[in-house]
A protein has these predicted regions:
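Hydrophobic alpha-helical membrane-embedded segments
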Residues: 133-170, 272-280
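Short, structured motif recognition centered on aromatic/hydrophobic residues
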Residues: 100-131, 164, 189-224, 231, ...
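Juxtamembrane inter-helical linkers in multi-pass membrane proteins
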Residues: 163-190, 245-249, 294-303
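Membrane-interfacial helical/loop segments at transmembrane boundaries in membrane proteins
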Residues: 231-259
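N-terminal leader/propeptide segments of preproteins
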Residues: 1-32, 38, 42
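Cytosolic/matrix-facing juxtamembrane and C-terminal tails of multi-pass cellular membrane proteins
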Residues: 179, 251-264, 271, 276-303
Length: 303
């Protein structure tokens, strides 16, 4: 290893970040958190030694930055291989178009669109209420503690949302928060938190989830309602005509041409096409939303 050994925790973290350059930002955040948590715990456990001495002491147990980075890359590759569904042979034409029904991510992304209305309302209410109470209580002695607790809860919610997005879309999201470092003093930590752009981008994400959740929910529900009603229209007509469930009588639609015999098969075909398009749309929305969430919730890889 040509690089000189780190003499401080900051140097170690910088070297580890450089070794992980180009990797997923969520992976980098997890690796940096684990390393900083371990290193600071070891330094605290040896108050009689300097950081340089502690780093030299644990070099053989925890590893150099390049060794740690390699271990994280190997572990990530194994986890991704285990979690990723087997890749099917590429299809073309109708196979590629209708093959979306065999993609589990299309279904989970559609479920995410339906769930987003509930999570959007919860996140928006949480963010707006927290900010309003923080501003209202700012003149009181409990104002600052309340704001700090609210910010801490915001990061917990952010981490939970990341896990939900990873489960629904497959996009890698952080499994660890960003380490708060070793800022000296209470006010230094507060200032560090306020200067962290993620503090504000996370709040922006939580607030934006309400309009996004409404849009996702409306598109999913309307798309499902129209496509499924078209698909099942012939079955409903047959049931009404033959009285399979104890009711007889034909259905009549307006305008009159909808009552033609050839319309029902066309409606069923249109429903299948609309449902297929909805599944493609849901999968695309899932991917785009995961990129949007990662941009706002994950710490940038550049320090």
């Amino acid at each position: 290893m040509t690089r000189s050994a780190p003499r401080s925790i900051e140097q170690y973290l910088k070297a580890l970040r450089e070794e992980l350059a180009g990797e997923d930002s969520a992976l980098v955040q997890d690796a940096l958190y684990d390393a900083e948590e371990y290193l600071r715990a070891e330094v605290a456990a040896h108050p009689d030694k300097s950081e340089a001495d502690v780093l030299e002491l644990i070099a053989s147990t925890y590893g150099a930055p390049d060794e740690v980075a390699s271990a994280y890359r190997d572990t990530e590759a194994k986890v991704k291989a285990a979690m990723t569904p087997p890749r099917k042979a590429p299809k073309s034409g109708a196979g590629a178009f209708f093959g979306v029904f065999l993609d589990s991510r299309a279904y989970t992304s559609l479920f995410f669109m339906l769930l987003s209305l509930a999570t959007g309302v919860i996140y928006f209410t949480f963010a707006v209420t927290g900010l309003s109470l923080s501003a209202g209580l700012a003149v009181l002695v409990i104002g600052i503690p309340f704001f700090l607790v609210f910010m801490a809860l915001t990061r917990v919610v952010s981490l939970a949302e990341g896990r939900l997005i990873e489960a629904m879309t497959g996009e890698r999201m952080p499994r660890r928060p960003v380490h708060q470092g070793n800022a000296a003093g209470f006010w230094a930590r507060v200032g560090q938190m306020l200067k962290d752009r993620r503090t504000w981008t996370t709040l922006a994400y939580l607030v934006s989830m309400l309009p996004l959740g409404i849009a996702y929910f409306v598109v999913a529900v309307v798309g499902l309602a129209i496509s499924l009603s078209f698909i099942f229209a012939p079955l409903i007509e047959l049931q009404s005509h033959y009285g399979w469930f104890g009711h007889t009588g034909d259905l009549y639609f307006s305008p009159e041409w909808l009552n033609s015999p050839w319309v029902l098969p066309v409606l069923m075909l249109a429903g299948v096409l609309l449902l297929t398009l909805l599944m493609h749309l849901a999968r695309g929305v899932g991917r785009l939303h995961a990129m949007y969430a990662k941009a706002l919730l994950v710490a940038p890889t550049a320090a």
